[in-house]
């Protein structure tokens, strides 16, 4: 809960689970978007301009779910501490949890959200980790469970499943190596028509498990349907809005050209993805791309 008035900031590529609640505060708060650069990373210069003494809340994702860009949480926290230390910092860690480390206490993060289904846990279970400054209102009233913050019988199997998933998640894995191998294969397949949508996959500002690229001129939905026949499943944009045939707001925030955005495909790697599986997927893509590029409109 926050006092009325003041500024609320969220990044241009936030998940709708964060963006929509922020937008709902318009009229009560001055709600502003923090822009991205071409790699999909928060522009710190723009954030510095947007931070005002009356800023109440800053929402930023640890890793963008479409581009795989890693946000500079340390620098964001430092700007907050210098310009508006009273502002709450909320981090959506759904795509970063167990893949990247984060120290809430050291950075002064006030709340951190995570979800079980992104680490092979059950769907419908997650956690909101709150720091000592955070005060939240009850989500629902009734029996007073969860310290009276969320009444209702706890989802005990889900909670146990989340813990089991955390304990079982392989800390030592080769996700980045597998992703880089896929990246090189796709570059070979599309040649000069290959476009990367996000940061350099080998860099520290790229998550180890997400690769977004365009194989121009083949439209993403055409390639998706072709690959389904091979039981290779990739995504165009966010999996949460896969039925909406419109350009990705994330790619739009990165100023990706329309034709390139229409060909964008997102690949997700997990600790159990093998080089052999990636090679199989790349072989299927190569076969379909060679045929489909002849028929796609120019």
Label the model's feature ranges:
Residues 1-298:
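Pyridoxal 5′-phosphate
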């Amino acid at each position: 809960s926050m006092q009325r008035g003041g500024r609320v900031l969220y990044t241009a590529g936030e998940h709708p689970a964060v963006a929509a609640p922020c937008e709902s505060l318009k009229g009560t708060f001055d709600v502003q978007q923090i822009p991205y650069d071409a790699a999909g990373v928060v522009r710190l210069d723009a954030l510095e301009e947007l931070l005002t003494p009356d800023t109440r809340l800053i929402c930023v994702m640890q890793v963008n779910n479409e581009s795989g860009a890693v946000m500079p949480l340390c620098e964001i926290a430092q700007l907050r501490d210098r310009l508006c230390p009273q502002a709450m910092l909320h981090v959506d860690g759904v795509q970063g949890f167990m893949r990247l480390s984060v120290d809430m206490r050291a950075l002064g993060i006030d709340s951190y959200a995570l979800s079980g289904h992104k680490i092979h846990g059950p769907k419908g279970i997650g956690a909101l980790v709150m720091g000592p400054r955070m005060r939240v209102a009850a989500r629902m009233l009734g029996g007073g469970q969860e310290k009276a913050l969320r009444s209702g019988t706890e989802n005990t199997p889900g909670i146990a499943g989340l813990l089991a998933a955390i304990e079982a998640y392989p800390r030592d894995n080769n996700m980045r190596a597998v992703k880089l191998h896929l990246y090189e294969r796709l570059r070979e397949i599309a040649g000069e028509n290959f476009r990367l949508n996000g940061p350099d996959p080998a860099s520290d500002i790229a998550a180890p498990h997400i690769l977004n690229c365009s194989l121009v001129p083949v439209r993403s939905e055409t390639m998706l349907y072709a690959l389904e026949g091979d039981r290779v499943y990739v995504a165009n944009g966010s999996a949460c809005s896969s039925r909406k045939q419109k350009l990705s707001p994330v790619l739009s925030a990165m100023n990706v050209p329309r034709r390139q955005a229409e060909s964008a495909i997102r690949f997700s790697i997990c600790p159990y993805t093998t080089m052999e599986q990636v090679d199989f997927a790349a072989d299927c893509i190569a076969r379909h791309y060679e045929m489909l590029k002849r028929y796609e409109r120019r």
